[in-house]
Curated annotation (Swiss-Prot):
Family indicated by similarity: Belongs to the CobB/CobQ family. CobQ subfamily.
Keyword entries, A-Z: Cobalamin biosynthesis, Glutamine amidotransferase
GO BP annotations listed: cobalamin biosynthetic process
SUPFAM superfamilies, per the entry: Class I glutamine amidotransferase-like, P-loop containing nucleoside triphosphate hydrolases
Pathway(s) per entry: Cofactor biosynthesis; adenosylcobalamin biosynthesis
Catalytic site positions: 337, 436
Domain GATase cobBQ-type: start-end pairs: 255-444
MF terms (GO), sorted A to Z: ABC-type vitamin B12 transporter activity; catalytic activity
Gene3D superfamilies the record matches: 3.40.50.880, P-loop containing nucleotide triphosphate hydrolases
Entries under Pfam families matching the protein: CbiA, GATase_3
Function: Catalyzes amidations at positions B, D, E, and G on adenosylcobyrinic A,C-diamide. NH(2) groups are provided by glutamine, and one molecule of ATP is hydrogenolyzed for each amidation.
Protein's name in the database: Cobyric acid synthase
Amino acid sequence: MAKALPIMFQGTHSDAGKSVIATAFCRMFAQDGWKTAPFKSQNMSLNSYVTPDGNEIGRAQGIQAEAAGVAARAEMNPILIKPSREHESQIVVLGKPYGNMQAFAYRNEFFHQGLAVIRQSLETLMNEYDRIVIEGAGSPAEVNLNDRELVNMRIARLANAPVVLIGDIERGGVFASLVGTLSLLEPEDRKRVIGVIINKFRGDVALLKPGLDWFEQHTGVPVLGVVPYLPDLAIDAEDSLSLERFASSVGGEEAIDVAVIRCPKIANFTDIDPLLAEPDCRVRLVTHGDELGAPDVIVLPGSKNTIEDLIYMKKRGLASRIVSLVNEGKARVVGLCGGYQMLGAVIRDPYGVETPLPEVKGLGLLPIETTLERTKITIRTEGMLTWAGERFSVQGYEIHMGRSAPLPGYAPLIEADGRHEGAKHSDERVLGTYMHDLFHNDAFRTAFFNNIRRQKGIAPSGVRLFRSLKEKAFDRLAAHVRQHVAVERIEQMMRQFGCRDHS
């Protein structure tokens, strides 16, 4: 595996900030003129990304490719694990569904096949790019799993990559977690760790210096940076833990109240990220009918198990409350992918794709019926959306196992590639579509919320370009990390490491 110089970021635990730091390095290397590819051998996430050629990968690697200024491709995340029901996940290999497997079977039956796919993907990228930014998962010190792990030190050895270990100081105990992780590594793996980064720091770094000095003396591993917490970073999150940033959103008395229904199998929740671009929107997550109130907008996001989440909504009083609010003319509803299916008359599952139940009654707010099928659709979508007497050019992507058919009274929401996509209620207060990234389309999003603003007596807003905000966020993140991390030292260590003999 020659040509590219790799660097790998591993964490002491999940959500330590590996994805964000890796994104920063993708951007920095691209800014410095290097053709850069992100790589994560195996990703477990319900947030996915469709590549230009219709393959499904983890959302983080798609965003990292954007940061690097290159087209995302399946080799950047050759294995994607999407939890679908208790102890079972859908396995996506090189962008296409492989099948559903339980955790024990995956670990014992898929290991060698998975490793072969990972090796080939990594070789392809190493031969075509200058820099490879590799992201691990969880912790490299999971001693009960390390004999068959496919995402941390085994990948570092495969790529002959130096490793930077990331610790999250926000959670507390950062030195214990860093030292503990290092102590649990095999000696040859510990030699790969060229340094650590302490992430999400708040306060005066001078107060941290005695701890940094102690750590370096105790472990012999250098601290390569202390990265202060960076608020309001408009970059898609991957981990559902990141949804909590919406729970604390606040707004004034005139704010537009947006309630996002948070079900257990919520997927592709990055669909709601552009709402952060609307300064007068208060976005809150709702899990029970009693919490719903009377919002201006209700968003039903995607789901990895639509039927189970629909049953969850019914049991918690959400379904009946949503229907009542619509019938009373008090709320607008937008359903995305699985949320779109829920808005229809019925969801049928003749092949047991999601549950043993043959069918479940939907909310009945859109004239469609859905049948879940074994074949997954993953495509990029472009078309014209018609709403409130206006037509908007929109683009996004679709990832779904079901197909929805129109019933009497059906009106399409989008005309895409010669077909009708999505649906809308006769009064246009209920919209549904399979197309993710609906709110990423700036003109439509602005018109949608300006309609609400006018009804609430709020001045209309100008168009805010979410893609521009994302590009600025990439640059802001890169500048932030350059300021607080010894980037040049890391690059020097990468070159030195590549010259070593690790056979």
